Amino acid sequence: MIENDNTFNKDEWEIIEKNYRKGGFSKISKAKKKNGIINGTIVNKKMIAIKKIKFDDKIQFNEVNNLELIKNKNKEMQISSIIDYFGYGIKGKNKLYIYLEFIEGKTIYELKKKKFPLNEKQISIILKKCLETMKFLHNNCNLIHMDLKCDNIILKPNNYDNNNNNNNNNNNNNNNNNNNSNINDDNNNSNSNINDDNNFDIKIIDYGLSQKIGDLKRDHYGTYLPDECILNNVSIVNYTFDVYSLGFISFELFYPTQFEIKPIKLTHIYEYVEKSQISPLFLNFIKKCIGRYLDIDVLEIHPFLNENYDNFENYFKFLKQTPLKRIKYRNGINGENDILRINNSTTITSEQFPNNSKMIEFGDDFNGIINVDYIANKKVVILNNPNYNIINLDFCFSNVEYICIKGIGVLEISKITHNSLETFIYEGEFKNDFILKPYLFTNTKHLILKNYKNYIRHRGIIPEGVTFLELSDSIGIEVIKTFIHLPKSIEELCFGCTEETLKQIERNLILQSINFFIINGKLMKFSKNNNLEYYE
């Protein structure tokens, strides 16, 4: 609820501390409303953060609109990491004042400057709370934060409110200098309280750059966004922007000093994090965020974020089922209205296809001709019959991001030359002398070739960027010896072989960057003696 008169009147406020925090576009002061009421909401003597922004045509009320939306959506959800919003005021032609909940605590950036250490358990708690907030923003508000970073995450000890209220009651007559001293003392105390692992909460702040999923990307963007976003190779806002940012936040949380991460190639990022002294599970989580091929539902159950670190089996069972779920999530495919199923042989023209359908599935009994126009604008395509007649196959998949092909005849896969496929599942056959060509999967991250058991003859056959690779369930040891040519981006490798072959697999045959293996349907790892063994 916003008052009719939104004029900011300084006389109505008691300024406790002016400009105690500054951002790129704003200054924040600590204050109390003298009459205890803000836009009809009774706040009594509650401390308020007044965010002052000099707005222009590009920023204007974007943050106000986002905060209004988030506030309304959070009434039912009650996500604790969402900051309370009380309205706004305007002064002059270009000064906007936003009234927010004042959070006692320090940003992660401030803690890092003081070289305050965080262990991996504390980091996992922080990241889990971040994911909860991201999931709420994405699913309930249809918003991407766009500027997730350590400076926009405040750590607040859970017992801080009571201590702060007592301090405020005892010190109402203190001057600003005394208040500043108390704040610093309190925050120093808060650092020790954070050591109690789960005895703290987080608040994610600053929604000035947030945008709706599917919007055109604006000129303003946050600190940690993908290279393709900064270099204007992508124009549509999607959830992977926030996931990517979380990967850099994860890495920074481990180190007590602030450093600048400039846009660099993905392979260089992998090499950098692999040299760091962090656990394999934490490293795996970071690489998944930076790789951007998992959605939040999958990241939430990652073993690093859960106390049961050994629960790998359920994690990987879920992982193998996620490609379609992920692409649905990303493209807003929420129900049957978004999915078009063709389950008969009736002749269909492209004009009969609804424009709003985002996914198309051709059933086993469809034996008509599939024209390029049918699937040109679809994000998800599922072909269940190996005998489809597809016209212009080489241009069919220019915009498709997920495809599952049961088979289009031997070698027909080689005709797919222009694609943006992130997830490719192919269950067709390969000739014995067939060699994969890297141009087939230039943008693919999740690659499943269920019948491929030929040699990986040289580096580049599987392109850099693939993170999940599944091959045939009958791989021989000579083919496994060529796995050394797989790209360093691969994190999970899935294949099958005989028990005799399994005994011959040595650590030097598999890239060190591959953390986990699913062999014959079971999760395996190399022991300290470099022998393959099952996870128990």
Curated annotation (Swiss-Prot):
Protein kinase domain ranges (all copies): 14-305
PROSITE patterns: PROTEIN_KINASE_DOM, PROTEIN_KINASE_ST
Keyword Transcription: no
Main EC class the enzyme belongs to: transferase
Sequence segments annotated as region (Disordered): 161-192
UniProt keywords, alphabetically: ATP-binding, Kinase, Magnesium, Metal-binding, Nucleotide-binding, Serine/threonine-protein kinase, Transferase
Annotated binding of ATP, by residue: Y20, R21, K22, G23, G24, F25, S26, K27, I28, K51
Entries under InterPro entries matching the protein: Kinase-like_dom_sf, Prot_kinase_dom, Ser/Thr_kinase_AS, Ser_Thr_kinase
GO biological process, one term: signal transduction
Active site: D147
Domain of life per record: Eukaryota
Any Gene Ontology CC annotation: cytoplasm
Sequence similarity: Belongs to the protein kinase superfamily. Ser/Thr protein kinase family.
PANTHER family documented for this protein: MITOGEN-ACTIVATED KINASE KINASE KINASE (PTHR24361)
Protein name from the UniProt record: Probable serine/threonine-protein kinase DDB_G0268550
Organism name: Dictyostelium discoideum
Organism classification: Eukaryota, Amoebozoa, Evosea, Eumycetozoa, Dictyostelia
